[in-house]
């Protein structure tokens, strides 16, 4: 017997398996201000008590494993273990529970979303004792928030760079998303920007394919930006997508965008990964580039109500990792997004301090201290008739992005941009005059049609378009 084994045996080590709840279920635990708090929706397998299921989550996402190990005696488990300190039954669900877990801050590397997620949502999601598991929310303590740079610039700095205030920003995703040559792509960018949009965007599907290599696209888009700026007197931008197969290639594209003098680049933070995203965000801050974030792949992770990670958690992770814009759903368009839930995570993106509010799905009070805010981007199946609702729902600090709702205009791209800009200006003016956009929205748009034939044509095309489907992810009643 080795000396280490003898020493361990002498202090009472007992090999074997014991229930997780004996160590990790600690209802008497008082969460510390420095703890990371998590709310999990737990669906145990039949026969597994909820206390044991919740404790298993705390164990397997912190210091625990399936059996006792003698090396437990070489550290302080009470200092490092996760604490499942509260559990509550989900209203209206027989076999679902919300388990609250507190994680000591020393479990996590400073400034690393990658490490935080690897621990909290790692192997535990495949645990056999659980039928399903969903991370509903995280409370990130200020002590941990302060280890992150966060967004490269934030809302106020972006407005100052663009010299645009008092209204939402307008964007457009270039369509068709795939197949255009670089020159034709640049032409569409120019026409949309000249027509009155603030931004155009690479579709998330666009990278560097045989029909359009990234360098060619960057050059033609830069030409379109400068030409439209000269003609309109407004600062313009195009989200040049830097996402690539390697981090080195991603950075090369960002460097080229900076050399062209364009104001903004784009990244897919979920498919590209948190490490790559954080690296790009640091580069963007150091070099004066805004960073637009797309959430491609999010619905694979967040759409099902009983399993995965809620988007409010992914939104918090993005604010920590870094991004100046992120797509957040529209409430009224073609993509999933219930109003109260959407407004909850929009506040988590923009505000410095957000109170707990279960009516909007916010499980914890979140203090972002000095971390800059992120502009939510409403995009997906929206058109001019949606403008009053979008302006009322998202307010000024947002980006309203119309792809088909610009490029599908019967008269072409520039008139489509004009229609959207006129509709937005009409809604902002009406709101500033005290009119109710929710009740008078259609009337406001019809009035604006009288002095904008471009808007009138757009209204005629999309007057019957609705996306009236029940949301999959809704609040517990």
Swiss-Prot record:
The record marks 334 as: Transition state stabilizer. The modification N6,N6,N6-trimethyllysine is found at residue 14. One of its GO terms (molecular function) is magnesium ion binding. Gene3D superfamilies: Ribulose bisphosphate carboxylase, large subunit, C-terminal domain, RuBisCO large subunit, N-terminal domain. The disulfide bond which can form in the large chain dimeric partners within the hexadecamer appears to be associated with oxidative stress and protein turnover. Mg(2+) binds at residues 201, 203-204. The basic functional RuBisCO is composed of a large chain homodimer in a 'head-to-tail' conformation. In form I RuBisCO this homodimer is arranged in a barrel-like tetramer with the small subunits forming a tetrameric 'cap' on each end of the 'barrel'. It is found in: Plastid, Chloroplast. Keywords: Acetylation, Calvin cycle, Carbon dioxide fixation, Chloroplast, Disulfide bond, Lyase, Magnesium, Metal-binding, Methylation, Monooxygenase, Oxidoreductase, Photorespiration, Photosynthesis, Plastid. PROSITE patterns: RUBISCO_LARGE. It holds the Pfam family RuBisCO_large_N. Substrate binds at residues 123, 173, 177, 295, 327, 379. This is Ribulose bisphosphate carboxylase large chain. The keyword Plastid applies. The active site is at 175 (proton acceptor), 294 (proton acceptor). Belongs to the RuBisCO large chain family. Type I subfamily. Its cofactor is Mg(2+). Residues 1-2 form a propeptide. The gene is rbcL. It catalyses: 2 (2R)-3-phosphoglycerate + 2 H(+) = D-ribulose 1,5-bisphosphate + CO2 + H2O; D-ribulose 1,5-bisphosphate + O2 = 2-phosphoglycolate + (2R)-3-phosphoglycerate + 2 H(+). Its EC number is 4.1.1.39. It is an enzyme of class 4 (lyase). GO terms for biological process: photorespiration; reductive pentose-phosphate cycle.
